[in-house]
Structure formats: structure tokens, C-alpha cells
């Protein structure tokens, strides 16, 4: 893989900065803001995210003067700008004049004005005015010397269930299916006599309406995803009329269920996301989210658009980041592919729902606080680091298959248990690789599979057209596939495959799934391997038959004791494993550890528990990020005979590296081709 070019050649450095909302403050504070930003080495400010009313106090009146001053001041201070469109929160005048722009809740009831992302994505009025504002901003500022990126709207979110959406949904369905007969066939509406005889009879899946046709719910999710994406694209195209060479993005939200970020990433010039860990999150959870963002555009570095410099305000418990955690988490983002470290927000708001959200400058306005000191020290360190990490790629040999439509269909499915645990299962299969410092890409239904040696596809309930054939070809060509129970059950309309489970995967897996047993909490079974090792399993247990697959493990209890629970099928030059049950974590650690050894996939660096190591490779050098997530010192043995430059201290290291608690190191060594 070749390294990537800088996101914008006018800003070839790690983007350090964050959300800046000067419209909330008197002009007398602006110069002090800029002085303190320079002290922190802020290089990029995100401006204008929620400034619609400040820019357009009435439909016929625009007030850009204050923004002119802000951008000019930032440019004079040496700070670049990621300029946002303010469409995430419409003005009160807009909702009052055009009440049809307001979102409707899942019962179809129109919401009142307030909050944010409270618009109907199919509203022609909303679309017109949002695109108009984007065009005016681009026309006015496309040549501004501070401009380095466009930030469209903010954290696109939930579905709307209004009459406009219902009508647009019916049009969308006509385009998708062509005829009502075809829709009825694909939705299986003969069940419970729910056959539609006129398009006008189809409604959104209201909370107090139709909920028994899973294909309806699945299609409505697809439809709403497309409508919101159209809103993004309308603003993007409005910007591109005037600003063709500046990257355009929007900020995503981790594993957000309601939007298919793979489809969104195709329309973005760079992926950006907002990282807000909860108190329950472990470092591997954030690593997985970073890997998702890097993978959405097939390995392209991403932007960490927001993180709190300390606490949040919307979690059940808004824990302060302990000294050193902000720095460690920022470097973890860089380690997984980020090209920026940015905060929400610069100055804490005096009022509103986020007045207690963490910020670089607190209500006191002081710069002698713990948080400010940590932000300033990190900025100075990143300035010294320079551009060494930019464009670095992560050469992963392991792919973890994830699909939003599969998630939607699986979670909506009635049976065999209410708890499908898709994300929890994805995490469980990711964890053994993360703990071993083996890089992982998230892969998708349309990804290029040939670059991987091992592909893990848990709970692949819904199979998109052509995916089974591509997985079979991957195995035939020498790849190793691992999949699980609940895989290969339905097609894209949530119709069960007529020849049973695992549907089109049956040949490559060499098994047939007869039944699925759902075990209630507290009830378990055993997965017994052929060598006698035994592991607890439970939750869901598929009762399968081998059709050519080698049986590696069997159930140890209940009426299906002795039935296959783990199989391997050799096909062509590759192999496909089927795990019929949900095993304890110890099994996955053992299974993937042995599989990696067999395949010859090595960690980027051997480390003690609690120390994470990742690899980013530029055109000139390999960069090993080593992060001690523990509170105690840890020593890492370095590969024999190799010398590394530690970029944060300038030390030359051989044999060993000792890290204090929450400490970070970046070890650089030249590529052989660059020597």
C-alpha cells in the first residue's frame, strides 16, 4: 500500500485545534481567544457549526460581517479554518414560517421547534435553504487564505416519519421494485394477509403501526439513510460550485446504527468522526472505532474532528480525564490513522445544554488550569513531531466484516433471541487481534478481499447479492474465512433462503444448519475440541451437520451433545471455519492465536498486557506507536538487531523500551527501500 498525500497541501501537518464558536461571545474576547490558541499551538479551528441564525437572522437577510472578521483574525494568527455549514440546527424563524420542515417522531407526530437535527430530510424547503446557505458561504470564502476544509452540517441523525417522508418513501419503493406485485413478493406480505393492493396503503413503520413486516422496516432504514445522504450531497454540490479543490467532510459518530457510513464515506473526501468514550469503554473499544473510521475509505487516514479535553456532559457519569489520558487517547487516534487531534470545544458555553461540557477554556477564562496546561503541552509536542506521521498506512492482513444493513436486519428479526449482540460479538472477535497487536481492517460487502489472508465475518445474517460468491472465491484463492451461527439466513429483503441455512454459504462452509437453540441467561453448554480442551459456550447454539467439513469441536451437553460445534472446510487453496455457538472469550483467544501462528501473521510488536502497539507506514519509514494504557511502568522488548528513533524524545533505542504509566512512544525505522 502506498502512503497517502496530505489531506490539503496547504496544511501539511497534524491538524490540532477544535470547535470555535465566536458568535456566542462578545468581540472583546476574540483577541484573547486567538492569543491563547497560539499559546496552545492550535493550527485549525472549526468555525460556524451552529451559526445559522447568526448568519441569516431572517430569510431575506444575511449577516456575514462577523464571520469575515473571525476568519481574517484567524488567518492573521496563523490558524487555518475548517468552515462548517450550519444546517444541523435550523433557526426558529424557519420552523415558524415553514412548520413542515420539522421532523416527525416514530408515531408520525410533528415535533416542535428546538434541539438540533430536528428537520425532515425530505423537506424541499429545508433542502433549498440549507443548500442556499452552503452556496453563499462557498461563494464568499472559497479563496480565503485560512480555508483548508469544509465541514457540512453536524452529526447527521435520526429518521423522520412525516407525511412528506411517507410520500417520498412510496416513490422510492416504486423505483426500487418497479411494481406492487414485486414488492408484495419480496416483502412476503401474504403473511397475516398484509398484501398491499395500492401504493397509497404503504406507510412508514410507525411505532403504533406496521411492525410485523421486517422488509418494510429494513427498507425504511435504507430510505432514510439515502434521504439524509442526499441532504449532505446537496450541500456538497452547492459548495463545489465555487470551491473545487478544498476537501469536504462531515462528522460521523462511531458505530452509529441509523446511518450506513460505508455509503456515506464514498461521498466524502475524508472521513471525520467524534470520539467520546464512556466510562465503560476500554482502550480496545476506541481502537475498534478508530479502525472503523480508517477502513471506511479503504485505509485513507481520517480526521479526529471532536473529543473532549476533559469531561462530557451527556453520559450517565461524566468522568474527568485523568492527567495523561488526554495525551494518550490523542496518540491512540494517530496510531490508528488519524491526521488530526481536535476538540469540542475551545471555550465553554455559558448557557444551554452543553454549558458543563468540557472545553479548553473553562468558565473562569483562565489559562492556568490543568486542562489548558495539558492541551498546551500536547500542542507543543505535536508541533515538534511535524509531518512525520502524515499519510501513513496500516498494512493489515486481517479483515473483520461489518455491514450496517446486516445489523439492521439482525436486530429487527423476531427470534431466535431478542439479544442478537452484533456489536458485542464483533468486539469479541476483534479483541484477540488487538491484544496481540495484529492490525485489523473493517471490511464491507463491497471491499477488495484479496489483500487479506484472514477474514472474520461474525453473525453474517443478511447476505447481499454476490457476497457469498466473493467469499467463496476468497477461500478458493487461498484465504481463510471464519464465520458463525446466524450467518447466511436471509437475502436483502429479509427472506429466508429456501434451501436452508447457511444459504449460499453452504458449499464453502460444508455444513447444514438444522436448528438453533437459544439459551436463557445462566444456561450454558460446552464446546469440546478433539484434543479434549473444553470451553463454556451459550447464548445461541446452532445444530449443524457436516457436508464435507472436518469437525474440530463438538457440543458437550444437552440432547445435541456430540453434534458439531466447530468445523473447518478446505476449499481450493483456502479454508473456511464455522463456529456454531457463542464461546467464552478464552476460546477466541486460543483459537485466533493458533490460527495466526498457522498462517504466519505476526504482531507488529510483542508487548506486555496493557501495552498497545500499532504500525503506520509512510513512503520512507515504519512507525511503531507504543501506548501504555496501564498506570504502572512497562518494559517492551524490541526486535533484536534493530535500532529505532523515538520521535517524541529524539532518543535512539535498541533492545528495550520502558514506558511510564499512560506514556507513549513512536519508534521510527527506515524502510529498506529508503536506505
Regions found by a protein language model. Give the residues of each.
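Conserved, mostly hydrophobic/aromatic
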Residues: 18, 37, 45, 74, ...
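Carbohydrate-binding surfaces of carbohydrate-active enzymes
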Residues: 199-202, 245, 254, 265, ...
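Polysaccharide-binding and catalytic clefts of secreted carbohydrate-active enzymes
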Residues: 107-270, 274-288
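The substrate-binding groove and active-site-proximal loops of carbohydrate-active enzymes
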Residues: 15-27, 50-65, 112-131, 153-160, ...
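Aromatic-lined substrate-binding rim segments of carbohydrate-active enzymes
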Residues: 32-38, 46-109, 235-242, 461
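N-terminal carbohydrate-binding accessory modules
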Residues: 1-46, 57, 72-76, 80, ...
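Short, well-ordered coil/turn segments that N-cap beta-strands
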Residues: 12-14, 41-43, 75-81, 143-148, ...
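Short, acidic/polar
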Residues: 25-39, 130-136, 253-264, 322-330
